[in-house]
């Protein structure tokens, strides 16, 4: 008699949330894990995946990705191909993410943070708190999980930045911060400002490694140790870091012919290039700057000559990358612990998605091979803790009753072989066959998403690590 939709047979399961590690079979029915036992009869399943010799992990949860604009919707497939089953889009807007999901969804779960942009979603860098509140209210009603401050790229004043963090906490939503303001940019000073701006409010500090490039103290390692010390003193803040050697920023130019993004400006000047068309083209031709091009199925880096030609073709309206992320900084942020033995930076992320650096498995398992992390710690930082951050208690583990989100991994080659989301195979052998997806939202977004027939689930942020992390406000202010 057939009982289960799918059986993952013979794999080596690593599930630190439930203290399970060893050879187990996993039975899936109706989008849920229903049995985890040493041996389950293959005859009970409609479909069997033989995982002998491979690892079976809870689906990866990436707490920092980018999936917009819709022309970069290939990011949905890129995530599924990398073993990711849930991701936090850190820009939005939610309507554009939904457009991309409809065009090229891969069956994964997506939460969205709508970004605060001076001259865009906000009137200016000095927007008053009431205006920020109004934008947050609209964003949540549209289905967003919260907001993203992008002060490193497009800074707000310190006053508006503080107001936004406070308003998000008052609304009980999620908030993340690419550190920087009109006071200090995307560097260690901007990072330290962000910690002060947050006060006792709750906040996700994005890509901690990105503020430690030697711009303020000359030594990336010294800056990283200082950043980790200050972050460890504020356990109420959640954080993530990534391991990609390249950053990502816009090459778009403003009316004065200067890059919109302050990060792009800094990278150009740090490399000895001018902050204009000439500098962008020269940096590309020299191989210092790599130009990204989005195709329907992928986003790729172009060779120098091709990249320069593409910049001209699209009038610099694309994304570019610079080799500014130090390996020492990536290592320290991924592995550093506090005196109690917990990780200072909660999660490993990629800042990937539609940016070609979805390195959770490839680089994360390299840390395992290096004995810098155990496999269980890797799973903790890429699935268990991220699920807790986002208030998704049925994800990040594979206990019976949990959502059937998992990945089968070739640990020797550091690659995913099978990605399963909500009990459906969405990637096998590198081929993505998943479609659509599910939006992770708050109670405020349910009506709008229901009216649009968008599949969704509500995160329990109040019980998640974002609001339960020790040391901050004891409850949401709203």
Regions found by a protein language model. Give the residues of each.
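Active-site microenvironment of metallo-dependent hydrolases
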Residues: 1-24, 28-29, 38-39, 79-80, ...
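Hydrophobic faces of well-ordered beta-strands that scaffold small-molecule active sites
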Residues: 59-65, 87-89, 110-114, 147-149, ...
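Anion (oxyanion) recognition and catalysis
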Residues: 80, 104, 169, 199, ...
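Active-site neighborhoods of metal-dependent hydrolases
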Residues: 145, 217-366, 474-478
